[in-house]
C-alpha cells in the first residue's frame, strides 16, 4: 500500500484491514438535496472525474450502486464547522461533516489519499480519518497591487488554498503602485491609478463582476475573501487619482518603485474622511464576508495622534457597514474595539503595543515576517524575493508555534495564522507559486494541526509526495534541499 501523505496532518488517520476502494466507471457520488450539499457534491465529482478521466454521477440516493462515495451532514462530530469524518472501505467512502465547509475539507483529504497503480487503476486505502482544524482562520494574503494578478491566476491560487485546507484569501488591493478594485463611488481611482505597477508594467484591476467571480470561486471551496484597502499610508495610487487628498491640491506622480512609508493621507484635509467613507462603504458592499482589512502599516511620516484618528475613523466606517475590522499590527497602538483583528508581521518592531492590545481583547492573527512571509528568499542564491526578514527555507516555515511566538500574548487571543506574499519581485503566476511551494503547505500545517502532532521528519516525507501533483497542474515550485524529492520516472503513487 502506498504511503498516505495528507497535508495538513489530520487529528487521527489510521489505515484499516481490508481491500482498498477502487474508483471505477460504476462509482457514484451521493448527497442530500440541500443546495449547499449539492454544490459540494458537484465539486467532489469534478475532482474525482478529473483524476479518473471519466465523469462521476451525482445522485440523491444510492439505488443499489456497487461503488458509492456518500456525503452527509452530521452533528456526531467534535465542535467546529470544519470537523469531518472519512471512512473508506472496499465498496464505499462515507464522509460526514458538521457543515458544507467540513465536507469540502474531507473531499480534499480523500483526493490526497487517491493512488494510481501501474495500470492506471485509482484506489484509496481502507482507512479512517477524524479531523478538525486547530485555528478557524488559516489564510494567505496576496499583494495584487505591486504586480497585478488576473482572475484566472487567483482561481488557480484558490484551488491551491483549498488543497491545503486554507480558508481565507486576503487580497491586498491597493498600494502606492496601483489601485486594483473598481469602486462605484470613486471610479477615477481605477481610471487614473490601475494602469501601473512596479517597474512600469501595465497593471490592471477587478471590476465588480470580476470580484464577484472571485467570490463565487472561493465560496465553492469553503474559502472567504478578506479585501484590504491600505490606509492611511501606502496611498500614492489614491493621491495620484485625487489631488484634493494632498496639501498642495495637486495629484502626486505615478510611483513604480518599491520604497515604503513616504505616502499618507492627511487628517486635516476636508477630502480625507469622505474618501475613506466612500471607499470602505463600497468595498464592504461588494464582498459578502465578515471582515474588511484597513491596512494601517508603515506610516512613517505621520504624527501618531493623527494616525490614530484616521485609523479610528476608517474602522468606524467598516463597522457602520456591518463588517468586522482587521488591521496590521501598527493599529495596536491606537484605541481598538474589542474583537478587532490585529495582524502581527513586523519582527523588528516593539511588540509591547501588540501584546497590550491582545491582553485588552483584540484578536490576534499571526503572520511573522521571518516565518510566514513567503516572498522572502529561500537562501542567498534565490533569484526572486526580498531579504529584510531573513531567509525562509521550508523548515523555517514549519518549525514555529503561533501561540507562544510573542511572550505575553494570551494563547486564546490567537485566532489564526496567515501566510503572506508580497509581489515587488513577482510578476506572474509561475513566479508566485515558486515562492509559495512548498512553504505554503508548511504554514497550512502549522495553522491546522496541533503542535504535539507536528513533526518535521514526518512532514518532509509527506510533502515530497506532493511534488508530482504540483508538476501535473503546472505549478512551479522550489526543490528545497531539506527534502528528499522523488526523481523523474518515480514509481506510480499519489494521483491527487
Swiss-Prot record:
CDD domains associated with the record: GH20_SpHex_like
Gene3D superfamilies according to UniProt: Chitobiase/beta-hexosaminidase domain 2-like (3.30.379.10), Glycosidases (3.20.20.80)
Documented EC number(s): 3.2.1.52
GO terms of biological process kind: chitin catabolic process; glycosaminoglycan metabolic process; polysaccharide catabolic process
Top EC group: hydrolase
Keyword Hydrolase: yes
Keyword Protease: no
Pfam families associated with the record: Glyco_hydro_20 (PF00728), Glyco_hydro_20b (PF02838)
Reactions that this protein is recorded to catalyse: Hydrolysis of terminal non-reducing N-acetyl-D-hexosamine residues in N-acetyl-beta-D-hexosaminides
Pathway assignment: Glycan degradation; chitin degradation
UniProt GO MF annotations: beta-N-acetylhexosaminidase activity
Keywords attached to this entry: Carbohydrate metabolism, Chitin degradation, Glycosidase, Hydrolase, Polysaccharide degradation
Biophysicochemical property: pH dependence: Optimum pH is 7.3-8.7 with 4'-nitrophenyl beta-N-acetyl-D-glucosaminide as substrate. Rapidly inactivated above pH 9.5 and stable from pH 6.0 to 9.5.
Further comment: The reaction mechanism involves an oxazolinium ion intermediate.
Homology family: Belongs to the glycosyl hydrolase 20 family.
Full protein name: Beta-N-acetylhexosaminidase
Gene behind this protein: hex20
